[in-house]
């Protein structure tokens, strides 16, 4: 059984027990998170697709850790002027384990 959920502006295919990294969600380690935006569920050959979401379907996950993504460097430069600026960014992410998929 697997489901497709929408979180953080992205779609993720998940199954029970999967470890998933998503955009930062509020909460701390051990907290439970419920996803109500379930776009599709497949169970034993039967596929149910929502328009746009499935009513009554939910996916429950548990937060494993709050982490940061890889460092991204941004470099700005003006030609012939000697101006340049280098900045960095690390995206806040949440790592979670999927506990339950229900229809």
Swiss-Prot record:
InterPro entries: bL21-like (IPR028909), bL21-like_sf (IPR036164), Ribosomal_bL21 (IPR001787). It comes from Syntrophus aciditrophicus (strain SB). This is Large ribosomal subunit protein bL21. Belongs to the bacterial ribosomal protein bL21 family. Part of the 50S ribosomal subunit. Contacts protein L20. This protein binds to 23S rRNA in the presence of protein L20. Coiled coil: none annotated. Keywords: Ribonucleoprotein, Ribosomal protein, RNA-binding, rRNA-binding. One of its GO terms (molecular function) is structural constituent of ribosome. GO terms for cellular component: cytoplasm; ribonucleoprotein complex; ribosome. GO terms for biological process: translation.
């Amino acid at each position: 059984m697997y489901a497709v959920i929408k979180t953080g502006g992205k779609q993720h295919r998940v199954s029970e027990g999967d470890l998933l990294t998503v955009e930062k969600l509020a909460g701390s380690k051990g907290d439970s998170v419920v996803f109500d935006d379930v776009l599709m569920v497949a169970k034993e050959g039967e596929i149910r697709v929502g328009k746009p979401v499935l009513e009554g379907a939910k996916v429950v996950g548990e937060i494993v850790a709050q982490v940061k993504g890889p460092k991204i460097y941004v470099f700005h430069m003006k030609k012939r002027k000697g101006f340049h600026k280098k900045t960095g960014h690390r995206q806040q992410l949440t790592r979670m384990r999927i506990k339950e998929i229900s229809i």
